Amino acid sequence: MFLIDQKIEFFMTGLDGFVENGFCELGPIIDGKKCESLLNKVVQTREFSSKLFLSKEEFLKNPEFRDKNPKKGKNNLAEKLDLDLIEKNTIIQESMEKVLGPNYKILLKKFIVSVPLQWIPDWIKEDTKGIALTNLGPYIRPEYSDMTYFIGVDFHQDLIDYKEKTANFVTLYVYLDDVDVNMSPLVLSPRSHIFGADTFPHNISISDDQNSIEYNNKKGRSEKFELKTIIGKKGSVNFWTAFTLH
C-alpha cells in the first residue's frame, strides 16, 4: 500500500471516473513476474502462519496497543526492499501527476497482510470479537511487526490515520498475487467520498445481497451507495481518495 500526496489512458473508470467515483482502477499494469519476485522476497522474511503471533502469556506480560504498525523511517519492511517496479512505473507516475500534481510525494509505503482465520490463535479471536477495526498489530511478535496485519476490517476512510492532515492524498494498492473473491479482496463504495470527512465508526447498513450500503453520515446526509469488490491479477493497481469508504 502507498499513501501518495499532492497523456494517460485510465483503465475502466478514467480520470473523470476518479473524480466522480472516488477511485480508479488502472488494471494489471505491473509485470506479473516482477510481482512474484517481490512477493517471494517478502515470504522469505518469515513463516506466514500462527507463528506470527505472541502467545497469550507473552502478550499479557506487556500488552501494547500503540505504535504497532510500520511507519515512515521506522520498522518498515517496504523501505528495505526495491519497489521501483511500482514507484517508477510510468502509468502510476503519470496518473499521480494528473491527480495530485507534479510534486507529489510518498507519505508512507508498507506491506499489508490479510490474515486467514486459521492462522489466528483462538484466544486472539475471542479477544478481538466485536472490534470493528481489527488491526492485529498488538498481537504480532515484535520481529514481525514491520508489516500491517488485518482481519475483519469495517468500512472506514483512510483519513482515520491522518486526523490532523488535509485530505490531499490518495491510497494506492498493488496486488502482488492474484486476488479472487475468496482472498479478502478490497471492497469499496464508489461515490461515497461525496459526503466528505466523517468520524469512525460510520453509520452504515449493508443490503441483504451485500451489493450496496445505506450510508448516514454525522451531518444528517443519507444515500444508498453501491459496493464494488476489487479482484484482479498480480500487478493490478487501484487508488482512491481519503474519503472513500472501503
Predicted regions and their residues:
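Non-heme Fe(II)-dependent double-stranded beta-helix
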Residues: 2-20, 27-155
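A structural signal for short, well-ordered beta-strand segments and their strand-loop junctions
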Residues: 25-28, 105-109, 171, 185-188, ...
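Short, glycine/acidic-rich beta->alpha junctions
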Residues: 88, 154, 167-168, 222-224
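A structural signal for well-ordered alpha-helical segments within the folded catalytic domains
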Residues: 90-94, 170, 233
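Histidine-centered catalytic micro-motifs
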Residues: 153-160, 244-245
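Short beta-strand His + acidic residue motifs that chelate non-heme Fe in jelly-roll/DSBH
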Residues: 172, 245-246
